[in-house]
Amino acid sequence: MQEAEIVTDIVFKIDGHVQKSFYSEEEYEELGCPLLIKWKKLRPICYEIIKGKRTPVKFRFVLKLAEEELQEMTDGLELGFTRQDIGGLYLNIVFENGKLNCITGTSLNIFTMDKTLERVWDKRVAIELEGTEKDENINKV
């Protein structure tokens, strides 16, 4: 998770960057030397903040696809750029004014007109949100 903001009677802001100095060298290596905290670790904390009798005023979660999953997703894709040109794939989940929006984002370190990666990412997110099995043809967009 890149970041989170939850607004109830107060504002909670979470920076998802792992603080390496919190861990011993061994612990950090056991975790796989992550730059960002996993959503599954923050999910129960966010749930505790959100749950209650009142709906939050708003919340926003910015999730970044893990590097391993990004590699798996881009394997076999014919892109006009390299894996190193990809800054990240993001899912922004925003609840505000009683509406929930899920917005995908793609960060590239170069300019390109090739929208293949964006289409594949949009399709993957749609499949995940629908709760269906992963389509074997997801990379064939």
Predicted regions and their residues:
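Surface-exposed, low-hydrophobicity interaction/linker segments
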Residues: E30-N97
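Charge-rich, low-complexity N-terminal segments
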Residues: M1-K40
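Solvent-exposed loop and beta-edge segments used for protein-protein assembly and interaction
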Residues: Q2, I6, K53-T55, C102
